[in-house]
Amino acid sequence: MRTTPLAKSSEIERKWYIIDATDVSLGRLSAAVATILRGKNKPQYTPNVDTGDNVIVINASKIKLTGKKASDKFYYHHSEWRGGLKAVSYGELLANNPVKMVEISVKGMLPKNTLGHHEFMKMHVYAGEDHKHEAQKPEKLDINKLI
């Protein structure tokens, strides 16, 4: 009888990838990053094991929002106090904190459990070109070839 080989977290080789977000749609970027973080682009993908790679996203401030999302789409959060609902438009969020906008988008595409949290911790987002992960020798990925 043949059995399917299951991946073990100790046997997985993790790579570092760097993705430039300049003029890339937010949803397409987030979907590609979530796929790499989950490890779905690898042949040894196993749903209950963290098989993904580390991803560095640079130039988050130059991301593209299509349509009227900059003015019509809002990010809501609540302070848990009565009347504490806060709403920030995506255009305002892109101007003030583009890193948070990318993190919210990618986090929504990952599982809502402990494994999803571990996968999310392997993503590093920077608003500009500079990042502090040169020692890991990240491979540059062209986002247009992934989507």
UniProtKB/Swiss-Prot annotation:
Keyword Glycoprotein: no
Keywords tagged on the record: Ribonucleoprotein, Ribosomal protein
GO cellular component, one term: cytosolic large ribosomal subunit
GO BP annotations listed: negative regulation of translation; translation
A Pfam family per the record: Ribosomal_L13
GO molecular function: mRNA binding; structural constituent of ribosome
NCBIfam families linked to this entry: rplM_bact (TIGR01066)
Role: This protein is one of the early assembly proteins of the 50S ribosomal subunit, although it is not seen to bind rRNA by itself. It is important during the early stages of 50S assembly.
Family membership: Belongs to the universal ribosomal protein uL13 family.
Subunit structure, as described in the record: Part of the 50S ribosomal subunit.
Protein name per the record: Large ribosomal subunit protein uL13
